[in-house]
Swiss-Prot record:
The name this protein goes by in its record: Putative phosphoribosylaminoimidazole-succinocarboxamide synthase 2
Enzyme class per UniProt: ligase
InterPro entries: SAICAR_synt/ADE2_N, SAICAR_synthetase_CS
Pfam families noted in UniProt: SAICAR_synt
PROSITE patterns according to UniProt: SAICAR_SYNTHETASE_1, SAICAR_SYNTHETASE_2
Disulphide bond pairs: none
Keyword Manganese in annotation: no
Family, similarity comment: Belongs to the SAICAR synthetase family.
Enzyme Commission identifier(s): 6.3.2.6
GO terms for cellular component: cytoplasm
Keywords noted in UniProt: ATP-binding, Ligase, Nucleotide-binding, Purine biosynthesis
One GO process term, biological-process aspect: 'de novo' IMP biosynthetic process
HAMAP family: SAICAR_synth
């Protein structure tokens, strides 16, 4: 299988490895961000999915273009299907998740906490009697601390964010306003494609002037949960998990076999890997309304990325 499992390019400066992305800080204040095919969930890498990195980059490109009038973003250029050149930002230490439904499988999801009996969370209150995957009265923000050291994200309330001096009140007000506006616009566009944008994660940073800017990715199958709109009502009535366009079913496969936060995760079978690859491709086409064009250059993905990034090598 043609996969980009890593993108270590020695000629590029200031390398930093993220969960699924390789980063290189350039002298001009920009950053090279390469999306690999690594699939991350439960704070670990589960496997690699063919074309996943290209889907993420191109889906984010579509959404950054759709939302540039709502919130400034980090995009400078796209030299390769898997690569974005972005402004280098000081990433804010709060991860912002916006949720429109009582859903999720992670330890910080409102459904997980709700099933544990919690009703007060993230500075809000939920009533008794709600069902799995039920729509919320209105979208809510569920912020968590950003685990820069590889630890687990921890739930936060808006007041805790300010009290702990993670953000100023003004920063939180701006960030939350952006997040809700981005989410509502995303839901509107997704609905036109027959999809429900269930929840999503945003990452923000500040530039040299302190301006808050959207970073990382937006409304991709990795950062978001999508359901098929035409089957949601029936699935909800029958208590079934809605048909999804994201990595949620891989999470579900793992969750049925172990506690991924405590146990060793079993190897993901090849048929599930290929199925997941097709899900990512289908998601791109359904979300954007555009046909996915895989690379057919004959090169390995790493060789192609390297060639397209040669203009950024020092001294070139």
């Amino acid at each position: 299988m043609r996969i980009l499992d890593e993108a270590v390019i020695p000629e590029l400066p200031n390398y930093y490895r993220g969960k699924v992305r390789e980063n290189y800080d350039l002298p001009d204040g920009n950053r090279i961000i390469i999306s690999t095919d690594r699939l991350s969930a439960f704070d670990q890498i589960l496997t690699c999915i063919p074309y996943k990195g290209q889907v993420l980059t191109q889906t984010a490109r579509y959404w950054f273009e759709q939302t540039k009038d709502i919130c400034p973003n980090h995009v400078v250029s796209y030299p390769d299907p898997n690569v974005v050149i972005g402004k280098r930002l000081d990433i804010l230490p709060v991860e912002v998740v916006v949720r429109g439904y009582l859903a999720g499988t992670t330890g910080t999801s409102i459904l997980t906490l709700y099933k544990k009996g919690e009703r007060q969370m993230y500075g809000m209150s939920l009533p008794d009697g709600m069902k799995d995957n039920q729509i919320l009265p209105e979208p809510v923000i569920t912020p968590t601390s950003k685990a820069f050291d590889g630890g687990h994200d921890e739930p936060l309330t808006p007041s805790e964010i300010v009290e702990k001096k993670l953000l100023t009140q003004e920063q939180w007000d701006t960030l939350s306003r952006y997040a809700l506006a981005l989410f509502r616009h995303g839901q509107e566009i997704a609905a036109k494609q027959g999809l429900i944008l269930v929840d999503t994660k945003y990452e923000f940073g500040t530039d040299e002037n302190g301006t808050i800017i959207l970073a990382d990715e937006i409304h991709t199958p990795d950062s978001s949960r999508y359901w098929m709109a035409d089957s949601y009502d029936e699935s909800f009535r029958e208590g079934k998990r809605p048909a999804s366009f994201d990595k949620d079913f891989v999470r579900a496969w793992v969750g049925e076999r172990c506690d991924p936060y405590k146990d060793a995760v079993p190897k993901i079978p090849e048929d599930l890997v290929l199925q997941t690859s097709q899900v990512y491709i289908d998601a791109y086409e359904r979300i954007t309304g555009q046909r996915f064009v895989p690379d057919d250059s004959g090169e390995t993905p790493l060789a192609r990325v390297r060639r397209n990034l040669e203009p950024f090598f020092p001294g070139v």
